[in-house]
Amino acid sequence: MLDTIALDLVPSDHQVHVALFRGVQNAGFLHSQLLARNAAFEYAFVDASVVASRNQILAAAFRALAVKLSDNLRTPNVHSELVTSLSPSNNIADAYRRFGISPATKDLVVVKITYPSDSAATPVSRDDIEKHLAENVHGTPAGFSDDELAVSTDWTKVKKYYKLNGLPWLDAIKDEQERKLQMDELVLGAMALRGV
């Protein structure tokens, strides 16, 4: 299941393709392809355990695209920029370690950002992306929705990485759904304020 999303405020030929996989059996292989900079595996592979919501991924994709469009990438490509955009700090290595794929990753969010470039006037198609993922990600596809992501979210990690521990007002919220909504908003705020 691959969702294709056109973000507001970016050119219409720049698209974001997102898939969620559960029970990934070959995370080590996928991780090694990223480390080898294999162009066929130029995706943002995000450990789903640190994803609080769809908005978190889409905000990171928007930021990565904005940086790409302004020619200010700090990382090798727009996909690695997306992974670092998830982090509340500017430490690139820390962002890769916390938010990117590792050999131990079980649930995986895969993002492919497509746009015309000097080397390819026509970006890779949605069907080609879906086929490549089906052949190379050994996991069970799931829908890219907040409900599906919630199954994978490790709130202990999210709270630690975004420094949400020890907030008495947050801990005092009795309604679990409301508490998660507030944490999601705090995560988005931390991402937006990075580097300010």
Report residues per predicted region.
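Positively charged, polar, low-complexity stretches
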Residues: L2-L9, V16, V24-F99
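Glycine-rich, aromatic-bearing surface loops/beta-hairpins
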Residues: Y96-V196
